[in-house]
Amino acid sequence: MLRIAVQSKGRLFDDTMNLLSEADIKVSASKRTLLVQSSNFPLEVLYLRDDDIPQSVASGVADIGVVGENEFVERGEDADIISRLGFSQCRLSLAIPKEIEYRGVNWFNGKKIATSYPNILRNYMQEKGVECEIHVITGSVEISPGIGLADGIFDIVSSGSTLVSNNLREVEIVMNSEALLIGNKNLSADKRATLEEMLFRFKAVKDAEDKKYVRMNVPKARLQEIINVLPGLKSPTIIPLADDEWCSVHTVLDQKRFWEIIGKLKEMGAQGILVTPIEKMIL
């Protein structure tokens, strides 16, 4: 049975459990149990702190794990990156009090920076040739400048609202981060087979994101024009109707261009346009 390490709470926990659910892998999300087994898939879920996940996977306590890229890089554990999952996106940034004039990263020479990510920060500053004092703290990094503990901070930024509420401004983006699926380097053949099945399901879910299934009635006289503006997966499905002068066209559209394309279709005479979301898409 495959064992996956998952963050025990927070946004990454929510996003991971949603992905498992959409892949029809049923798992209890009880906060009182650290190890639970799926009721319909050969998978155990081990709930851990996010900073413990890289080591648990590298050591073989867990076979695979979902972890923020920021934690994976910071810990430097020897595990494989299997897939980028595209959710729980954030960035690691340097921030300083907003009233301070900032002229570049050399401002941090001789300054004290508070962070929970000393390794990433140290490597970045060495690359930039900046000598600074790194003060490691594990929580509430953003209050450090306000209480005189540091001149600036290096921390996770999502919306930036926490920085604003603490009178700080972002001055350097050091790295972008998203959820990663990582794996132990020595998985057995059976576990790799289970992993491949899970990845197949994940891909079907991810491929369906921001896609719409569109059905419409179109005049046959303009059918080729309409086909030419459809950026479907391959060729759209054409179905004859009782009225010989009309046919039904089925296709898949990307949400990013949905309204642009729908407008063109209406101009070309498409009618009865029906739009439905797609749960999963197997290419």
Q: What is the predicted role of each segment?
A:
Residues 1-43, 69-80, 85-91, 99-283:
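Small-molecule-sensing regulatory modules
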Residues 37-55:
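Active-site-flanking structural segment that lines cofactor/substrate pockets
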Residues 51-56, 61-78:
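Pocket-flanking alpha-helical
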